Structures are given as structure tokens and as C-alpha cells.
A protein has these predicted regions:
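Metal-coordinating catalytic core of metallo-dependent amide/deamination hydrolases
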Residues: 1-74, 78, 109-116, 122, ...
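His/Asp/Glu-enriched, well-ordered alpha-helical/loop segment
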Residues: 53-64, 71-94, 99, 104-108, ...
Length: 233
């Protein structure tokens, strides 16, 4: 009914970058330091993931895939592309969750496949990413939390908090990070990876209309207008 739906399946394809459990296309930059591994296996065997995704896609479910490392993001896109070809399905609005690292060559595939980019600006708070940034390394920082690049490639962007696995569920903090890429104290002054900052309008759209579109509710929520749900904070 309108209040309760069971129409989505979420897969955990990897872990997180801080613990080196998110598969990367290239080895972690701090491999070998304090016993850090060079890379990681997938949290779910790829063949099993692809098989289950195909099955649930065919049965009409919307699929969310937790993928943080750039290799995981690529394999998730590959799996969605395969499911569309095998099942001849389109318009499911499947999602990839988090996408903290991504290869530039994979970004156009989001719009092409109709896969939504579900990301959390609060995770890019410059005050909490020292371990993360060391693991990724300087050369890959420009590929980190690429909100602007996603929009430039016409991807559908949806923002959320990832609560309780984040600093705070407060969307105002998330909006601040998305627009400024600075801590609330103003560090760093120029912003962290500033080329990936987006406008207030773009960030607000991702937090509101993006989520509504993701759940096929863009005609009843996500905007302030007559007839829409008054989900206002």
C-alpha cells in the first residue's frame, strides 16, 4: 500500500575503503603499511551476484547495489547491463549506493543504462577522511565522490544520509558538504576536490526530487506544490 512496500533488493558487493575491503581497479596506495592489503575480494562472489540480480530484475524488483570501490562500481554496472540485455527490461531505476571511487570512463554508463547514482555528501566531510584519502592516494582523489561529474554526464543523482553509518542524518550538513566540500569550520578554504562541488539547487534536487524519482513517487513527493505530500523539515 502507500505506506509499506516490499519492492527492492539490496546487494552488498563490497565493504569500505578505510578497511581496504572495497575492490579497486588499481592497488591501494598504502598497501603494505601496517599490514594493509593491496586490494580486496568482493563481499559477494560475482557469479552469484549476477545470477541473483538477473533473477530479481526479471521478477520486477528494483535493485540497489552497495559499491564503494571503483572496481565494484564497474562490476555493478556490468551486472545491470547484462540483466537488461538478458531480461529485456528497462526503466527499473536500479541504483548503485555510495560510489565513493569511480573511473571516469564508467560515468557515462549511468545515464546510458538508467542506473541512478545514490551518494551521501556527509561521507566526503574533509574532517573525517584522512584514513580514506591515504588509502586512495593523491592520484585518485579527483575521482572521489564525483557529484559534479555525475551530473555533467546526465546521471540521475539521489542524495541521502546513510544513517546511522555517518556523522549525522542532518540533511543541512549534507547540503553544506555537497555545495562547499568543506567542514563546518571552513576547512579547507578552497574545498576538498573543489571541482566536484555542485550548486545549492542541484544538491537540493538530489535530496528531494532525486529520492522521489528513485521510488517512482515523483508525482506525489519531492517538491513543494499543490497535491504533493508535505514532507517538509
Amino acid at each position: 500500500n502507500a505506506m509499506l512496500k516490499a519492492v527492492r533488493i539490496k546487494f552488498m558487493l563490497d565493504g569500505v575503503i578505510e578497511s581496504h575491503t572495497a575492490p579497486m581497479l588499481q592497488p591501494y596506495s598504502d598497501a603494505g603499511i601496517n599490514g594493509n592489503p593491496a586490494n580486496s575480494d568482493f563481499a559477494l562472489p560475482l557469479e552469484l551476484y549476477r545470477s541473483l540480480l538477473n533473477r530479481f530484475d526479471k521478477e520486477g524488483f528494483q535493485i540497489y547495489t552497495h559499491a564503494i570501490g571503483d572496481r565494484s562500481v564497474r562490476e555493478a554496472l556490468n551486472a545491470y547491463e547484462n540483466a537488461q540485455a538478458v531480461n529485456r527490461t528497462k526503466g527499473k531505476r536500479h541504483r548503485i549506493e555510495h560510489i565513493e571511487q569511480s573511473s571516469p570512463e564508467d560515468l557515462p554508463r549511468f545515464a546510458k543504462l538508467g542506473v541512478m547514482a545514490s551518494m551521501e555528501p556527509i561521507h566526503a566531510d574533509p574532517g573525517t577522511i584522512a584514513v580514506w584519502a591515504t588509502a586512495v592516494g593523491e592520484q585518485r582523489l579527483s575521482h572521489s565522490f564525483v557529484w559534479a561529474s555525475m551530473l555533467n554526464h546526465k546521471a540521475k543523482l539521489v542524495f541521502s544520509s546513510d544513517w546511522p553509518a555517518c556523522l549525522t542524518p542532518d540533511p543541512m550538513r549534507g547540503l553544506h558538504n555537497a555545495v562547499n566540500r568543506r567542514t563546518i569550520e571552513g576547512y579547507p578554504a578552497a574545498g576538498w576536490v573543489p571541482e566536484q562541488r555542485i550548486s545549492v539547487k542541484e544538491a537540493l534536487t538530489a535530496y528531494t526530487q532525486g529520492g522521489a524519482y528513485s521510488s517512482f513517487e515523483e508525482h506525489t513527493k519531492g517538491r513543494i506544490m499543490p497535491g504533493f505530500l508535505a514532507d517538509i523539515i
